[in-house]
Amino acid sequence: MARRPAVLWSAFLAVHAWLAFVGLTHATLPWGDVTLQYRPWVQNALAGDIVGVSHPWVYPLVALVPMLAAMVLGPELYGIGWLLVVVVTNAVVLAFLLARTGPGARLGALKISAAWWWIGFLLLLGPVALGRIDVTTVAISMIALLVAQRRPAVAGALLAIATWIKVWPAVLVAAIVVAIHRRGSAAIAFVASAVALGLGVLAVGSGANSLGFIFEQSSRGLQIEAPVSTVWMWIALVDPASATVQYIPTINTFQVVGAGVAEASALMTPLLVASSASLLVLGALVARSGARAVHLLAPLSLAIVVGLLVFNKVGSPQFVLWIAAPVVLGIATQGRRFVAPAALGAGIAAVTQIVYPFGYDALLALQPWMLVVLTLRNAALVVLFGLAVHMVWRLRRAHGPVRRIHPLPESQVI
């Protein structure tokens, strides 16, 4: 019964309806970004004051496209309009996963398992899984990873679009270039598409504001949910004179303030870049040693993406959604080999929902039980990072025996 498309689609719609209901009605306003930020941006844009064109913006300009689409029902029903955009976007992913899944075929069974995991992951992560612009980039990235080995140019073009919505998918292009044999097609398609989109952005008159998102993000401090902030959150509890939680109204977020915070904040971006670069070098060595792309792409992508979370100074809860793209690829192509990262990723999603939205007031109040929950979540991210790196390294040490796990041959990958 679980393999019937009708059951999957019913679960898909039920989860989206529930998350939208919570997001729009809960007292903590989990979809506040949608109704209190996206809607005014769109209304201003329709009036001629376009973010990313008239002035710098926190996102690349293409992010405005899905926000504009959500205005389909008008400003009063903008939240419902956003839900429609998200449902359509995610429905494309689910339809893609269910395409060509013949009964009894191993490929079909794995893709259905991946679809179920993804739906469950969204439910566990909570309303933030749908109530941020990240949902569009994850959907595009998911399809890009799934087609990367057979259609690398398509993957590159898709990831260029995703990168012009939010920057993080660019690391997936790097992982694809390292892991697959037809790397040139992916790289050329990505660069050509990104440049074409960039020229389009400049054509609407954005000028230097088209790159404003780079400076907007780099100037941020340590957000309270970030793994690196955990130390100062505990210091704020035991010694409020040394560290505190402070609201920053200009970016609508809470950050830690205290001795050493500025220095740590300055270090995080270089550490994040070093992590990604080191993993790409490791991936290149593993690929050169003879590991097949079908084995390598999913764990390498997962390691790099989780590294973005571990070394990120922002640490917003919706970032956890990024994990879904490489895990879905791993389940769809390797099955049981990805049970551990899939289970750990699902657990991280569930704990993240406790942190936000349901426990966020307790976190701001520095209640000890909530700090324990946050610490466990951040520790789990570090564990998942280590697990993914180990999976990549293991391919280099003994990529031959890994075949006993029977991942799909590359000719059968989506």
Regions found by a protein language model. Give the residues of each.
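Multi-pass membrane glycosyltransferase architecture that uses lipid-linked
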Residues: 1-213, 264-414
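Basic, Lys/Arg-rich DNA-contacting stretches centered on the C-terminal catalytic core
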Residues: 213-214, 256-262
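Short hydrophobic/aromatic helix or loop-helix immediately within or flanking a transmembrane segment
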Residues: 40-43, 53-77, 222-259
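Transmembrane-lumen/periplasm boundary regions of multi-pass, lipid-linked membrane glycan transferases
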Residues: 194-221, 229-242
